Amino acid sequence: MKFSEICTFAVIYAAYLAARRGKRSRAATAHYEVRLLENIVNLVYILKTKIYRPGVFRVFYVYEPKKRLVQAPAFVDKVVQHAIVDNLLYDRITRSFILDNYASQKNKGLHFGLDRLKRFFTDYWNKHHTAEGWVLKCDVRHFFASINHDKLKEKLKKLDLEPVVYDLLCIYIDCSDGLPLGYQTSQLFALLFLDDFDHFVKEQLHIQYYGRYMDDFFLIHPDKEYLQFCLREIRAYMDSLGLELNEKTQIFPIRNGIDFLGFHTYLTESGKVIRKLRHSSIKRMRAKLRHWEKEYPAGLVTREQILQSWQAWDAHAAHGNTWALRQQVRDRVQNILKEEI
């Protein structure tokens, strides 16, 4: 599809539906919908005439699971980004990705990555008949904020994009230092930025058991000295991109388990894989329960808000060996609401 083909009512309306998904209750979405037909017709026009320019983004902090600065685009810019990413960029950028690049892709994601790690552990035990071995666990320091614009643009040029698309993407890139969290394009750009690195680990370092979720990745290997060599090579590669690994990067025994994607996954000597929910997630849920016990009787939180939050946590926790913990939390929620759920 070419840029001119996304400048139609049908494509922009579909992009609008994608942009509003899960956000219909927000003021910006409601404001756009008041004059929906007029807004879409106008957006098609300014895209066709190539006079579209992104607006000012909204800046705020999120605090779960950790404090992060988010730069959210205006709703109309979210619509444009969906139109471009979904129709022009996604397939072109992701077609070279390795299987074990897990973030922000169709049919992948957090739980796909967890299942791949489990498969790696099982395969490792079947191959070596032991849980002895080593893990190199890495995390890129301030990944989004550290992405070099010129190097990213070089990677985009290799995609052979139309000039109008490339120029528009450069505007998104240059709207802030690094890449702004909250932009759909930023997620895809971040994946692209380390795509060559993924191939380097798999094809040059010959690491069979490797997985990455955005800036968080692991290598599993029976030889500690080889992982020490890999770490030196990885640091050099990151330096060439203007990135650095943070202080959490370390090499440790497989038997310690891997803290990845919200769970601590262990390989036992018998070959069993055990997945435990990260302690910080349990701690946050217990804090919520204490707040709900005070706030619900006072009318400061609704039944629907409690159920929505609990159900999201429970669905995530269900991917681990957490039956007893989930029952405990469920019982407390039922006690707060005074009803069975």
PLM features per residue range, with description:
Residues N39, I46, D115-M214, L219-R235, ...:
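Conserved polymerase palm-domain catalytic core
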Residues A103-F112, F218-H221, P253-G257:
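Beta-rich nucleic-acid/ligand-interaction surfaces
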Residues P73, K78, H82, Y172-C175, ...:
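Right-hand nucleic-acid polymerase module
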Residues I84-N87, I234, M238:
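PAPS/PAP-binding and catalytic site of the sulfotransferase fold
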Residues I51-P54, I207-M214, R284-P297:
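Short, conserved aromatic-histidine micro-motifs
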Residues M1-L152:
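Conserved two-metal-ion catalytic palm core of "right-hand" nucleic acid polymerases
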